[in-house]
Structures are given as C-alpha cells and as structure tokens.
Amino acid sequence: MYEYIKGKYIDMYKDYIVIENNNIGYKIYTSGSTMAKLPSIGENIMLYTEQIVREDFIGVYGFLTKDELSMFKLLLTINGVGAKASLSLLSISNVSTLKYAIKMGDEKTITRAPGIGKKTAQRIILELKDKIEIDILEEDDEQIINKVTDDKKVLEAVAALVTLGYSEKEANKVINSCDKNNSLEQIIKEALKYLMK
C-alpha cells in the first residue's frame, strides 16, 4: 500500500519508531540496524515500507534502504520466519553481513539473532543461499575479511553491553559510533565511557 513514508522523526521505542506526516503519527516497525542509523529526533526522514495484514494485526515496516526492505521481504518467504524474526535477523548487523553469512552457511552468525535457533538458521541458509546476490563478494578478499571481522567485533561488543544490562538499541547506537579499528576490549571500554556520561 505504501512505497515509502517521509516525515518528521518523532520518537523511538523498543521495536518501532513514530513518523509524523500531515499531523498523523505513523507507527513504523523497524530493525535495530535502521534505528542505529537514524538522525536526531525532530529531523525529517524517509523509510521504504511494507505493510503486513493478518486477521489480528496490521503493521507497517520501514527501512532506510531498499536493500534492507528487499531482504526483509525475502526472509518473510521462509516458512516459520515471520516479521518479528526477520527484524531480529536484520538487527544483528548490516544487510551485506547477513547475506554473506547465508551464502557462506555461517549458522553461528545467523543464530546471534534473538529467537533464531539452529534449525531455523539451517532453513534460512537452505532456502536463500542460491537466491541472494551479495555485493560484498565483488570486493577483493582483504576487504571481505576486514568487513566481516569488523561486523563480528560489533556483534560481540553489542552482546557484551546487553549482558551488562543495556538494551540492544542503546548498544547498537553506541558501538556504531566507536572506532572499529580498535580491539574488542577497547571498543567496549569506549562504549561504556559514553554510556556512563
């Protein structure tokens, strides 16, 4: 129904944000990765959207990029993977890393997503491995290794902060602003300094 929604970014909650357009506040469910890249509240944003209609629920899901929206829709084609699980998968890192994990059969990375077990990860790999195209494979080997290493570092740092009691949303936002060239320990220390301000 909606191709995209453009308006003022009003507020953020656990799994959705509110965008105001023509004095109407739209509740848009989104991923942790999109939330981490949003500008300050009060600024104008545009999200590419998909509406899901069920007997007991109508919801609009939005993402900053068409690539993330396409991946969300692709994940929904898998039996047993609903909108909530798809958002969880898209929240573990960026789309390129998720695609790379699927293509390489990396169950460990996929099961980092809350609510995604080994069997579901195997089903995702089996059904999507030959369907996805990944830009990351067009880069040279060194770039691929660096990108995946950085993303794994981010995932581990986020997991560490969540263990310490911070929300995944908070952790993602802070970690994404840290210097990824640092060691995992340094990234966590830098994030904690910021969170304790």
Curated annotation (Swiss-Prot):
Primary subcellular site in the record, as a coarse category: cytoplasm
Signal peptide bounds: none
Gene3D superfamilies named among the record's database cross-references: 5' to 3' exonuclease, C-terminal subdomain (1.10.150.20), DNA helicase RuvA subunit, C-terminal domain (1.10.8.10), Nucleic acid-binding proteins (2.40.50.140)
One Pfam family matching this protein: RuvA_N
Region (Flexible linker): 145-149
Gene Ontology biological process terms, A to Z: DNA recombination; DNA repair
Keywords: Cytoplasm, DNA damage, DNA recombination, DNA repair, DNA-binding
Single annotated GO MF: ATP binding
Family listed: Belongs to the RuvA family.
Its job: The RuvA-RuvB-RuvC complex processes Holliday junction (HJ) DNA during genetic recombination and DNA repair, while the RuvA-RuvB complex plays an important role in the rescue of blocked DNA replication forks via replication fork reversal (RFR). RuvA specifically binds to HJ cruciform DNA, conferring on it an open structure. The RuvB hexamer acts as an ATP-dependent pump, pulling dsDNA into and through the RuvAB complex. HJ branch migration allows RuvC to scan DNA until it finds its consensus sequence, where it cleaves and resolves the cruciform DNA.
Official protein name in the record: Holliday junction branch migration complex subunit RuvA
Protein source organism: Clostridium botulinum (strain Langeland / NCTC 10281 / Type F)
Gene: ruvA
